[in-house]
Amino acid sequence: MGHRSLYRGGYLFLRLDEDPVEQVDGAVRALGEARARDLCLTIDFEEMRLNKPQAYPPVEQVQRTIIAALKHVSQTMKCTPVIYTDWAFGQRYLNSPAFARYPLWIADWTQGRQPRVPPPWTSFAFWQRSDHLKRSLDPADFDVFNGNATDLGQFSRVAGSRNLDTGHEGVLSSWRRGRRI
């Protein structure tokens, strides 16, 4: 996809019962060498990541695990990772000011004009508005980027491509199963 001037990225479904550094290392190996328009890794944290959702782990334990993963992404990939979550889990587990420095990809399937953003964030980078994209032959999510093409380049893994202008602004689609963003 890099040859078609599309941005692409990977995400890690963070598991709380496995070492966060090893999980990040595995994701980085799977992504391979960075190319132009490759986005930094997204850390995905949502209810389905818990083995037993009815037995929520302590907030501090969850926060330590997520922070360890985020810091390791930053150190290893030399870029700022994005956090993907929904409002309920963001409010419950990601309410520490330490998370505000990481861009937010909020899952909020609403018809509203703006998503609900959990504290400590006041804004979002990406908004997943729906789990289906009309007119797509493949299963795809409907995501909106809160910025323009220059802003999107700031999420790149490759420093030289952080200011590319593609002429495309605003809306992204992401294919499930890691195929496209």
For the regions a language model picked out, list residue spans one by one.
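Conserved N-terminal glycine/acidic-rich loop preference
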Residues: 60-66, 91-102
